[in-house]
């Protein structure tokens, strides 16, 4: 089976942590977290091997909406 990954860049380490903890069907393959004042953007690679596009996009949309609507 061929490996496949998607890389997502985040505006803050808090956003990155929230997404990693709340996306249930994707596995974190690798990530890098930078301090907010460093000027770098944090990123996470998710393993999407064997996933159909909707298996990736729909959960990502849901968790990003949760992030935007948090209190």
At which residue positions do the language-model features occur?
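Short intrinsically disordered terminal tails
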Residues: 1-3, 65-71
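A general secondary-structure signal for short beta-strands and their flanking turns/coil
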Residues: 1-5, 41-43
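Short, surface-exposed ligand-recognition loops at beta-strand->loop->(often short) alpha-helix junctions
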Residues: 6-15
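Acidic, low-complexity, intrinsically disordered interaction modules
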Residues: 16, 20-64
